[in-house]
A protein has these predicted regions:
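Cysteine-centered catalytic environments shared across enzyme families
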Residues: 1-289, 302-305
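Glycine-rich active-site loop/lid subdomains used to bind and stabilize high-energy intermediates
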Residues: 4, 26, 106, 265, ...
């Protein structure tokens, strides 16, 4: 039994029909996906229909390349494929796990679902026992991280498909296959540092622009940090050429609240955000202060809407308001600086140098520290004490 709560982010997906049954080949296919390399994929597959939905395009990729077709895809996706004649079921998630998909094998029946609702409705309380290992690991971790053990969920018999993996269930046997390992990617070698910089900028620009399809309203979370500012600085001029607006959202503190913080903490980032906004005439900025609210104000609503226990409840109020407002304005894609600490700005200097030393890049660690101290006029003694 296949079902799909259809949601669409792009014009091509508006009239998409999922699940899809290929009657000629007797293959069942369903997807939750938005592809980044759509033009390149269409060219490889010799498809000229500009309106083909991402899901159907992905199915053509499966027909062309078979089980490992996801190696040719880029984007946020999950797929389920059932081939009755071969008694084979395949379940995929994307390279970094943007699209979560959960599954559980009960006897000879395999259940899968994006959320946990299916398991709550179909399983008894005995089958849906809480995972003490998952809960203990999350509680012992001081950060907001909820992924101590990849693949585990709050329920013992329910598992989450790991990033860059797919499962294959055939002839009563379940196997898990990893289709991508970043450590094994071919390294790029240039003579000059400027060549690396140019490649980073080109890649980053393409990643942002590929999301901005015509006919979609775009929103973006914008702080004064490097991650979200960089994304907005690419998206805004690109949209301006098409005569389109970029809605930006910034969380600011309630004026009535008195913040006590050290000199390095900036509770209100609006002044720096306004400087960024002033550079782009097509940005319409929105500042969210959640006046009179706190993390407990809408707790009942949040508990109903969130599948998992969470630890970053302090951010829920403004995240909910931003999403609600963006949706009301017809925005279907929202850009964020998520994961930027590990890919763009590298977070704070202590995290960066700790990572460099752990991976034995000692010269890089020393250079990073020296550059940071010089640029920010921080005494070496103070830094070492920190």
């Amino acid at each position: 039994y296949f079902a799909c709560g259809h949601q669409y982010f792009t014009p091509e997906a508006v009239h998409e029909i999922l699940p899809y049954h290929d009657k000629e080949r007797n293959i069942f296919f369903t997807a939750d996906c938005i592809l980044d390399n759509r033009p390149e994929l269409m060219q490889e597959l010799h498809i000229t229909d500009a309106d083909i939905p991402d899901g159907l395009l992905s199915y053509h990729a499966y027909l062309t390349w078979g089980e490992r077709f996801v190696e040719h895809l880029l984007g946020a996706f999950s797929f389920a494929i059932y081939v009755p004649d071969a008694d084979t079921f395949l379940l995929y998630t994307d390279h970094v796990g943007n699209r979560c998909i959960n599954y559980s094998l009960q006897g000879q029946t395999l259940y899968f679902c994006t959320t946990y609702d299916l398991f709550k409705e179909c399983f008894s309380s005995e089958q849906l026992k809480l995972s003490e290992k998952w809960i203990t690991a999350c509680e012992s971790e001081p950060s907001a991280c909820m992924l101590a053990f990849p693949g585990l969920t709050p329920f013992e018999e329910v598992f989450q498909l790991k990033a860059a993996h797919y499962i294959k269930y055939t002839n009563g046997k379940l196997s898990e296959i990893q289709y991508w390992k970043p450590q094994k990617c071919k390294k790029i070698h240039y003579r000059e540092e400027e060549q690396y910089k140019d490649l980073v900028v080109q890649t980053f620009r393409k990643c942002v622009e590929d999301l901005l399809r015509p006919g979609t309203q775009i929103a973006a979370n914008l702080s004064s940090g490097l991650d979200s500012t960089s994304i907005v600085s690419i998206a805004a001029p690109f949209l301006e050429k098409r005569g389109e607006i970029l809605h930006t959202y910034t969380s600011i503190p309630d004026e009535a609240h008195d913040y006590e913080s050290d000199a390095y903490f900036v509770p209100d980032e609006s002044s720096a955000v306004k400087k960024t906004v002033a550079c782009f005439p097509n940005i319409k900025s929105h500042f969210i202060d959640c006046k009179g609210e706190n993390a407990l104000t809408h707790l009942k609503k949040f508990v109903e809407e969130y599948d998992l226990p969470i630890k970053s409840a302090i951010n829920l109020s403004w995240i909910y308001q931003v999403n609600h407002d963006a949706h009301a304005r017809g925005c279907t894609i929202q850009l964020t600086g998520q994961m930027g600490n590990g890919t763009l700005s590298y977070g704070d200097i202590l995290s960066l140098t700790y990572h460099q030393m752990r991976t034995f890049h000692l010269i890089q660690a020393k250079q990073s520290i020296c550059d940071f101290l010089k640029k920010n006029h921080v005494p070496k003694k103070y830094f070492l004490h920190t």
